[in-house]
Structure formats: C-alpha cells, structure tokens
C-alpha cells in the first residue's frame, strides 16, 4: 500500500510541478487518477490474492471488497476512464492546469 500511495502522490506532485514550470510556455499539465479499473492485470491480481488467502471478509474476493469500499458500488472499466483522458487531451481543457481529476468511483472521498 505504501508504494501505491507514494506513486499516486508522486503523480500529483509531478502534475503540479509540471504545470508551474510550463505555464510560461502556455503549456498545460493535468492528470487523471483512476481507481480500480478491470483489466486483465486486475483480474489476475484478484485471483492471486484469493489464492494466497488475502481477503478481509470470509468468502469474499478482493474485487468484492474493493467494490464495497466505493461510493459508486461498482468497479470501473476502461470505457469509464477514456472520456476523462479524451477531455484532458482536447481543447476543452485548455484553461485548466495543475489539476488531478479523480475517476475512482468515490474512493478518494472516504
């Protein structure tokens, strides 16, 4: 968990520092922070964690534990994230900089 949290905050700091450093060149720097996104890597991780007995509730897979912790009671799929990435790459976001958009089903407001 420590490495995960450190990397998330590293992305936030990089976004802020990049925005500060590049603003004078009229370059914007923003980011998005996805939560749990179901991909083949996530599906394998979920299976591996169940296989080694890592679960907080009896009979419940890690995927279910994460889903229960989200405000929106479902994990996301790549289709849920792509709109935010497209927005940030478009001219519609040209007046924002230094922002991190959390696309995490409410995880960060717990």
Model-derived segments and their meaning:
Residues 23, 28, 96-98:
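Short, small/polar-rich loop/turn modules that mediate ligand/substrate recognition or access, typified
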């Amino acid at each position: 968990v420590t490495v995960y949290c450190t990397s998330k905050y590293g992305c936030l700091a990089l976004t802020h520092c990049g925005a500060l450093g590049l603003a004078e060149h009229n370059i914007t720097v923003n980011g998005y922070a996805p939560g749990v996104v179901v991909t083949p890597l996530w599906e394998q991780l979920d299976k591996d964690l169940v296989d080694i007995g890592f679960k907080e509730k009896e009979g419940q897979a890690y995927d279910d534990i994460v889903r229960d912790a989200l405000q929106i009671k479902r994990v996301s799929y790549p289709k849920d994230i792509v709109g935010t990435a497209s927005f940030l790459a478009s001219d519609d976001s040209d007046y924002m900089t230094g922002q991190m958009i959390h696309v995490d089903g409410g995880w960060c407001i717990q």
